[in-house]
């Protein structure tokens, strides 16, 4: 029997990042930061853009997430303020040897506040383990636009997510009352689950747009017109929209990320009447 001790390998260092910000309306009708705290590799950048809205770009200097990494964003948009939040690039969730990667976003909007939450897509690798949660509390007269896209492997590079664990939960409250709850859960054989007609019908890129505002329901016909104008059918993107109780919801399904991104870009720009943040074009 060997007298040498069994080596004790150091545990992988987990990456933890958090951005907490506040935004408020200042003289002249523009929005400025009122508070900002950053920890770990997650940072906020404020590019100079024209217009009254403040644009914030979230930057992950770690380059990706895996194996128990934790990222969180908390944003409080004050009365009458207007902000856009996006990311510098697509977020990558790498294969995990067990621990779950956690991403959380907590959004609060005061009276007449506006926020467009427009991160670029999240790309999942085979064996990824992800738990993502988005919660929002908005005033009755606030306007919140949420967009998120998930890509299950980049088909152009021959990637397929055969196995993994995905939990994606959205909770939206207006005036203290829960008005929207949506949870996606895929465990184990992810590719097989996505192939089922009742889930994704073989789609490998999915996106959701939720718009909560007093006039949300009146914009349904316009959104459906944008779906047609975006050429979703020609791109092979399935799209459907519905509206109820001050909410407008759009779902997009595509065989891969490129047509989904193309359709989403056209729809988002038409819906908001503004170009997407410049980082979307790089």
From Swiss-Prot:
Span of the signal peptide: none
Superkingdom of the source species: Bacteria
Compartment annotation: Cytoplasm
Swiss-Prot/TrEMBL keywords: Chaperone, Cytoplasm, Nickel insertion
MF annotations from Gene Ontology: nickel cation binding
GO cellular component, one term: cytoplasm
Matching Pfam families: UreD (PF01774)
Description of how the protein assembles with itself and partners: UreD, UreF and UreG form a complex that acts as a GTP-hydrolysis-dependent molecular chaperone, activating the urease apoprotein by helping to assemble the nickel containing metallocenter of UreC. The UreE protein probably delivers the nickel.
Role summary: Required for maturation of urease via the functional incorporation of the urease nickel metallocenter.
Family according to the record: Belongs to the UreD family.
The protein's name in its UniProt record: Urease accessory protein UreD
